[in-house]
Swiss-Prot record:
Family annotation (SUPFAM superfamilies): Heme chaperone CcmE (SSF82093)
Keyword Heme tagged: yes
Protein name per Swiss-Prot or TrEMBL: Cytochrome c-type biogenesis protein CcmE
Transmembrane segments: 8-28
Superkingdom, taxonomy of origin: Bacteria
An MF annotation (GO) of this entry: heme binding
Gene assigned in the entry: ccmE
Organism (species): Agrobacterium fabrum (strain C58 / ATCC 33970)
Alphabetized UniProt keyword annotations: Cell inner membrane, Cell membrane, Cytochrome c-type biogenesis, Heme, Iron, Membrane, Metal-binding, Signal-anchor, Transmembrane, Transmembrane helix
Lineage: Bacteria, Pseudomonadati, Pseudomonadota, Alphaproteobacteria, Hyphomicrobiales
Pfam families: CcmE
Membrane topology: Single-pass type II membrane protein
GO biological process: cytochrome complex assembly
């Protein structure tokens, strides 16, 4: 091999290595990214079953149903739409109706419901996950109180008017 051929072989090998590394990084990120949706977003842009997402909103009043073992089903709402959620596991201590929640999982094509593998609840009376709070503010379903921020009463009950008292 001449010097020119050696140089081209080294450059070609280096470029191949860089392309392979970039493709591996893109593949790894593609597997771990979970986009955030509110229930109303899912009505506008349906998600393919098996696609991993984060679903946020409020736990609808009267929707928590305990099943066999540690299985719990409940409904997540943003005041406009509702999504049934099924979760098997131990729920956070602060999980309850009318409170903010972010679930992560996938849609099940057979049941047409959301199957969560993790559930996050707000950790005190003044906290709501930023994504959920921003979306509720955009929809007019957020009330700011003297004691701190809280979801509007109509949002937890699924009232579509968004009116606060």
């Amino acid at each position: 091999m001449t010097r020119k051929q050696k140089r081209l072989a080294i450059i070609g090998g280096g470029m191949s290595f860089i392309v392979a590394a970039v493709l591996l990084v893109m593949f790894a990120f593609g597997q771990s990214i979970a986009y955030f949706y509110m229930p109303a977003d899912l009505e506008k842009t349906p998600v393919n079953p098996g696609t991993r997402i984060r679903l946020g909103g409020l736990v609808a009043e009267g929707s928590i149903k305990r099943g066999e073992g540690r299985t719990v089903s409940f409904t997540v709402t943003d005041g406009e739409a509702k999504v049934p959620v099924s979760y098997t596991g131990i729920l956070p201590d602060l999980f309850r109706e009318g409170q903010g929640v972010v679930t992560e999982g996938m849609f099940d094509a057979a049941t047409h419901g959301f199957v969560a593998d993790s559930v996050l609840a707000k950790h005190d009376e003044n906290y709501m996950p930023k994504e959920v709070a921003d979306r509720l503010k955009d929809k007019g379903l957020w009330q700011q109180g003297a004691e701190g921020a809280a979801p509007a009463a109509s949002a937890a009950s699924g009232d579509k008017t968004g009116a606060t008292k």
